A protein has these predicted regions:
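Conserved C-terminal structural/oligomerization subdomain of aldehyde/semialdehyde dehydrogenase
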Residues: 1, 52-175
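ALDH superfamily catalytic-core signature
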Residues: 1-69, 94
């Protein structure tokens, strides 16, 4: 998958020093996400972090994280084109990593899975405390509703009691 990420314009961040720079620019001092990264392009974030040689057309900075959940701030939500990559050996291990990240930040929100294996889809859905499971669709956009999935179109997604919200669905005029 990393090879495909590269083909699609990802810059893979593996160097420990570059990862530390990325952590610091996104989460200064290990705290809240930096508002200065919001909405920036991948090359702009890289420049802010002092990461050299990132091509101008780079679409995402993909950092190989050092752990799951609280073990690495790059597992947290980032409102910019930065993502974490965490290798795993089995499907179950991958789902366990996802659950650990959701427990740390994101409980009740959503997951996305791309699979033709119904057993894998069901397994992932059952393991996660989420309000919506997006299957074989771009979850970043269709979790908020789409004519192809039956979710109510919205820009406000409830996380239910897992996320300390009063509702678990997609907010609409009916709520």
């Amino acid at each position: 998958i990393v090879t495909e990420f590269k083909k699609q314009g990802a810059y893979i961040v593996e160097d420990a020093e570059e990862k530390d720079k990325l952590r610091e620019v996104c989460f200064p001092g290990g705290g809240a996400f930096s508002r200065f990264c919001v909405g920036n392009t991948a090359p702009e974030v890289a420049e802010q972090a002092g990461i050299a040689d990132v091509p101008a057309g780079t679409r995402v900075l993909a950092a190989v994280v050092d752990g799951v959940g609280a073990a690495d701030v790059l597992c947290r939500e980032k409102l910019c084109p930065v993502m974490g990559i965490l290798p795993y050996k089995t499907f179950e291990e991958g789902v366990a990593n996802m659950v650990a990240n959701l427990e740390y930040e994101g409980k009740g929100h959503s997951i996305g899975i791309h699979s033709a294996d119904d057993a894998h889809i069901e397994y992932a859905a059952i393991q996660c405390s989420v309000s919506r499971v997006v299957v074989n669709q771009p979850s970043g956009t269709t979790g908020g509703g789409s004519p192809t999935n039956g979710f109510t179109p919205t820009t406000t997604l409830g996380c239910g009691s897992w996320g300390n919200n009063s509702f678990a669905g997609n907010l609409s005029y009916e709520q």
